[in-house]
């Protein structure tokens, strides 16, 4: 769902509802592979004005429940549940603070296995929302540390600012790229990040670069050649869409995207997508909608 500035006042007042924004990787370079399988990367994260919504209702039974299951993901493996349990355990072990239970409902719009960070974003929103609802009073740094134990991409969603990421993705430096319009194309397949990491072979000598050095050249994603080779539908889509603009992969896929200076131009190409191929147009944002909502709620004390 698109986050609309016209609805921002309503989103701020209904404190049970929290946005969970998508992200894109404007570029992604693999610079090495650790013995444990983790990949050293350099990438630039930017948020989209589009994403999921999570609804939180605290309960007295101290149980954590996800009301609507996400197809293909067992509840115990869901990052929302893992994030909530992580915060609950941390508060008990480190603060001797017994938190209440919670029922969580998700309105899912970010495609699963699309490289838009839906699971990581959901986990980050859960940590931030429950930090407020349970009155944990933890800092963003502490929440980011908790998130990092669950998923590498979670901290960038906790901080809510576009960033240049290094290491295995955990070293973040603030960076503000231009806020352009993006056409996101959603192929009808899901791609497992773990599967791609296991298959990826680093066959080049990579050098660490600054973010500005990457931005001086055409942007690319090092996972794209392998994914195009293994998923013919993505290769065909990129070939077809290259008639209109330069498209590239975000994350480990499956979604591909292109950037535009105007929303009108992006929508013009959206309407040229092949039948049964979905997509949407969104503005890139350097401050996530979640961070905006949290700031406004805090300023107006609507969370107290």
From Swiss-Prot:
Name of this chain's protein: 4-diphosphocytidyl-2-C-methyl-D-erythritol kinase
Classification of source organism: Bacteria, Pseudomonadati, Pseudomonadota, Gammaproteobacteria, Enterobacterales
Binding site for ATP: 111-121
GO MF terms held by the record: 4-(cytidine 5'-diphospho)-2-C-methyl-D-erythritol kinase activity; ATP binding
Functional description taken from the UniProt entry: Catalyzes the phosphorylation of the position 2 hydroxy group of 4-diphosphocytidyl-2C-methyl-D-erythritol.
Reaction(s) catalysed by this chain's protein: 4-CDP-2-C-methyl-D-erythritol + ATP = 4-CDP-2-C-methyl-D-erythritol 2-phosphate + ADP + H(+)
Enzyme class: transferase
Cited NCBIfam families: ispE (TIGR00154)
Enzyme Commission number: 2.7.1.148
Pathway as given in its UniProt record: Isoprenoid biosynthesis; isopentenyl diphosphate biosynthesis via DXP pathway; isopentenyl diphosphate from 1-deoxy-D-xylulose 5-phosphate: step 3/6
